[in-house]
Amino acid sequence: FKIDSYANVVLQYLRLESFHDDLVLKRVPLEELVKEVVRKYAIFFIQKGLTVDLHDLDVAVITDRKWLLVIIEQLLSNSLKYTSTGGIEIYFKDQTLYMKDSGIGIKDSDILRVFERGFSGYNGHLTQQSSGLGLYLSKKIADQLGHQLQMTSQVGQGTTVAIHFEEKKLVMD
């Protein structure tokens, strides 16, 4: 699964070159998308004995489904890598999707650089589980979609990632 995951990240990175060629903006039901990703990673929740708390996700956002799926998969994968007890909470509030874990957290000196290409930080070096591309890719995709990706963290407490969806005035047919 690890090699598969790295290969997928590299392929998505290469696809960024033609990002706008297959961009399809439409209403995407968030709960359905999040549950799809959680189901994909269910075995890891079970193996690690982690809880998952999904709430307030009954909302649709204007985005490209496949690219948002890449972002959510990457963020959930990261949360699972660095969380060994407790769980992950995913919810929507004030035009923002939050993913909050009870993982090991990220040092203040690293949090400012987590979205840089190739940066894996202290945790990535410690666990040898980071390519340094996943969060970079997620940020690039979010920027291309017009979404804001932000992260806050406390060592020993966990990390919260927020994807903010700007209100768009699009004509839907």
Where are these regions (language model features)?
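A conserved beta-strand-to-alpha-helix junction within the catalytic ATP-binding
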Residues: 24-42
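Acidic ATP/Mg2+-coordinating residue in the GHKL
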Residues: 101
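Short conserved segment of the HATPase_c
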Residues: 106-119
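Short beta-strand/loop element within the Bergerat-fold HATPase_c
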Residues: 85-96
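Short helix-loop "hinge" at the ATP-lid/N-box region of the Bergerat-fold HATPase_c
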Residues: 79-80
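Conserved micro-motifs of the catalytic ATP-binding
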Residues: 18-23, 56, 60-63
